[in-house]
């Protein structure tokens, strides 16, 4: 996919609310992995991406999830994100909190070795996304 014409998040077809959250979070323009992954993910297509650490892969999959969840009924987990490490799970949660603010997308994280009661409380809040 040629991403040369997609130099900013506005050209990706994102809502104004999400664009504002991106700006607030310090995102100025999509990285190559984001420019390639976001458009097909917004249409519901499965996406597989490979890029080096620090290239914005987490945002590349969180952005379309937040955008799609904004128009779906609330009240139960509507997305499940699996990560291979606790560190990546917490990073993903932080990204969701930053980019899902305007759409009021909530998330909780479940990881081994953490306080089980706190995690149960998080589940009882019926988050939109379970990491």
Predicted regions and their residues:
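Helicase motor core with emphasis on the C-terminal RecA-like subdomain
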Residues: 1-3, 124-125
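Conserved nucleic-acid-binding Ia/Ib motif block in the N-terminal RecA-like helicase ATPase lobe
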Residues: 11, 16-27, 35, 74-131
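Walker A/P-loop NTP-binding motif
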Residues: 35-47, 58-74, 87-99
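Conserved pre-motif I regulatory segment
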Residues: 2-50, 67
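The conserved Walker
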Residues: 51-55
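Short aromatic/basic micro-patch
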Residues: 32, 60, 131
């Amino acid at each position: 996919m040629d991403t040369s014409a997609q130099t900013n998040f506005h050209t990706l077809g994102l809502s104004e609310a999400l664009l504002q959250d991106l700006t607030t979070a310090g995102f100025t323009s999509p990285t190559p992995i984001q420019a390639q992954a976001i458009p097909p993910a917004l249409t519901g297509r499965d996406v597989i991406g490979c890029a080096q650490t620090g290239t914005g892969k987490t945002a590349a999959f969180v952005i379309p999830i937040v955008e799609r969840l904004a128009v779906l009924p609330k009240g139960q987990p509507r997305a499940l994100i699996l990560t291979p490490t606790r560190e990546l799970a917490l990073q993903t949660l932080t990204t969701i909190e930053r980019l899902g603010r305007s759409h009021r997308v909530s998330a909780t994280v479940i990881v081994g070795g953490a306080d089980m009661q706190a995690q149960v409380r998080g589940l009882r809040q019926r988050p939109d996304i379970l990491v």
